[in-house]
A protein has these predicted regions:
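A gly/ser-rich beta-alpha-beta helix-loop segment of oxidoreductase catalytic cores
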Residues: 89-98, 104-133, 139, 205
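Basic, gly/Ser/Thr/Pro-rich low-complexity segments located predominantly at protein N termini
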Residues: 15-16, 47-49, 89-90, 113-120, ...
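Gly/Ser/Thr-rich helix-start
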Residues: 11-12, 43-45, 54-57, 86, ...
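Phosphate/pyrophosphate- and phosphate-bearing ligand-binding catalytic cores of soluble enzymes
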Residues: 3-9, 47, 138-294
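Structural signature of FAD isoalloxazine-binding scaffolds in flavoprotein oxidoreductases
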Residues: 10, 18-22, 48-66, 118-148, ...
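Short N-terminal helix-initiation segments at or just after the protein's N-terminus
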Residues: 79-81, 108-117, 156, 183-191
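Short secondary-structure transition/capping segments
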Residues: 51-53, 115-118, 242-243, 288
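Anion-binding (especially nucleotide phosphate/pyrophosphate-binding) glycine-rich loop
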Residues: 2-113
Length: 294
């Protein structure tokens, strides 16, 4: 999995699947053994696969589920339908070029629409689900459904199904306010300049590791505890942005997870604040999905 996640670390998966289209994906899921762990993967950010690998099926969305188109407007709003495999920056540019506004922040998200939906990705004041009209999901039987925000518990970097079924996002319909293309493109350029200046984009990383606690910033707390530069093996708390853990070259998933645990324990003991992971960790020495617990 190291080649497929942005941390460039982690063990092997039992099965890889690149669906040709949604029908192909439905047939694949329907044919899986009951209880087979399934991991949907876009660009591989926000994810750590343990060194023992993932004992299940990894489904890649970025090749097949990449359609994007403008739909009939909702009043003055631009409506865009995008597949789960569409990179978030691509969606941001599409919205701008079609006269929409409010998606500029997505230019700084290093993931896909599917990943953004799954965690309510956001930055620079924007959040994914603020723009969602509806989503399309697929379950283990290959059944595709249309759902709305009412079907989910949505919060800061948190999305949970209210109906309890195991489903994955395959696309969404978004609505955006009217905007100006030139202004939107300029705003995206400015955000990207800011991102390059403040984040360690020259080294493998997964994006922000921890959620910001209410009224504070994880990076500030980590830096206050003197943890910038702390390392285990080749995994290091970035000296450029404390809420990033970088792979200096050859880091194992265990190295990265050890840094995460040390940061959480240190911040908790010194400040009383319990940092909650934003990144998902899957697998184990035996390859069993660890889920998304903090």
């Amino acid at each position: 999995m190291a080649r497929h996640v942005t941390w460039r670390a982690g063990g092997r998966a039992r099965t890889f699947f690149h669906p040709a289209d949604l029908d192909d994906l439905a047939a694949f899921l329907a044919g899986l053994p009951g209880g087979e762990p399934v991991l949907f993967l876009g660009l591989g950010s926000n994810l750590l696969v343990r060194d023992g690998g993932f004992a299940g099926a990894v489904v890649f969305t970025h090749r097949a589920l990449k359609g994007i188109e403008a739909a009939p407007p909702l009043g003055p709003k631009l409506v865009v339908v995008a597949g789960a495999g569409v990179p978030a920056p691509h969606l941001a540019r599409f919205v701008a070029r079609h006269g929409g506004g409010g998606a500029e922040w997505m230019a700084g998200v290093p993931g896909t629409v599917g990943g953004a939906l799954a965690m309510n990705a956001g930055c620079y004041g924007g959040e994914t689900w603020k723009h969602v009209v509806s989503v399309r999901t697929i379950d283990r039987r290959g059944t595709v459904r249309t759902r709305t925000a009412a079907d989910y518990e949505i919060g800061y970097r948190h999305v949970a199904s209210r109906h309890g079924a195991e489903e994955w996002f395959v696309g969404a319909t978004f609505a955006f306010d009217a905007g100006d293309e030139a202004a939107a493109m300029a705003a995206m350029k400015a955000l990207l300049v800011k991102r390059v200046a403040s984040q360690p984009l020259n080294l493998p990383n997964a994006g922000s590791v921890f959620r910001n606690p209410p009224g504070d910033h994880a990076a500030r707390l980590i830096e206050t505890c003197g943890l910038k530069g702390f390392a285990v093996g080749a995994a290091q708390v970035s000296t450029k942005h404390a809420n990033f853990i970088v792979n200096l070259g050859g880091a194992s998933a265990a190295d990265i997870e050890s840094v995460i645990a040390h940061v959480q324990a240190t911040v908790k003991s010194r400040t009383g604040v319990e940092l909650v992971r934003e990144v998902r960790i899957v697998g184990s020495a035996g390859g069993v999905d660890a889920g998304a617990a903090p």
